[in-house]
């Protein structure tokens, strides 16, 4: 089972052992010809249906799985929204601030500063009592921030292959408000464990209904689709399929 990108594919024609290659997103379109070359000798697995490339043959999609015990359920949140992720334009930190301001909600921002110019020019001037930046969070801080939030804001501007923070939030029972891009429609069932929106104004509007989302259902749905046990079970079925076909 290859998780190491395309380099081990060069061995797939030299061995009789079946090979599964999980593609964790494409760093560049230029690596596609390499994957295409080994279409018949490696069995590709995507981490979301949205991250598939039409020119490749896929055996299946297996979603990333998390240890659900690392995330405890919080039934009664505090009165704030959370942005959790890299401080980068693609992640939508500035859009999260706009959403919070328009909704008249407190926003806590947690994450590493990946784009310093973006942070110091666009984000830092917006910080106030209402918009708070707490920096990178360790696992315990992450669990507390996510569990106590009314909602996680995830206003991405790119086709994200899989949103780990979205699943982590739901495992805490916290609903998510996400921009409808990439894998988000596979993670979020609109109106059930969060909301899919197209822009800032759409996010502001659905926040009026965030209280209608049952936090217990958020966790239950995340466990059923995105637990480590579910991921291991799905891969085990693929191993059996290859070994006994």
Identify the function of each model-found stretch.
Residues 1-245:
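Catalytic cores of nucleotide-sugar-dependent glycosyltransferases that transfer UDP/GDP/TDP-activated
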């Amino acid at each position: 089972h290859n998780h190491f990108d395309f380099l081990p594919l060069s061995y797939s024609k030299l061995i009789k052992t079946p090979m599964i290659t999980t593609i964790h997103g494409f760093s560049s379109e230029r690596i596609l010809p390499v994957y295409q070359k080994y279409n018949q000798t490696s069995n590709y697995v995507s981490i979301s249906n949205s991250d598939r490339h039409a020119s490749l043959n896929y055996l299946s999609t297996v979603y990333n799985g998390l240890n659900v015990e690392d995330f405890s359920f919080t039934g009664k949140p505090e009165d704030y929204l959370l942005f959790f992720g890299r401080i980068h334009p693609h992640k939508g930190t500035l859009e999260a601030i706009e959403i919070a301001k328009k909704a008249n909600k407190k926003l806590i921002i947690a994450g590493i500063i990946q784009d310093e110019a973006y942070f110091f020019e666009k984000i830092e001037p917006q910080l106030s009592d209402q918009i708070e930046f707490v920096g990178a969070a360790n696992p315990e801080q992450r669990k507390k921030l996510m569990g106590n939030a009314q909602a996680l804001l995830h206003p991405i501007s790119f086709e994200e292959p899989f949103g780990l923070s979205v699943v982590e939030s739901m495992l805490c029972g916290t609903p998510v408000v996400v921009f409808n891009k990439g894998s988000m429609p596979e993670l979020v069932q609109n109106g059930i464990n969060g909301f899919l929106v197209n822009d800032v104004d759409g996010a502001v509007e659905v926040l009026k209904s965030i209280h209608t989302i049952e936090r217990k259902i958020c966790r239950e749905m995340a466990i059923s689709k995105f637990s480590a046990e579910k991921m291991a079970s799905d891969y085990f079925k693929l191993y059996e399929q290859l070994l006994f076909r």
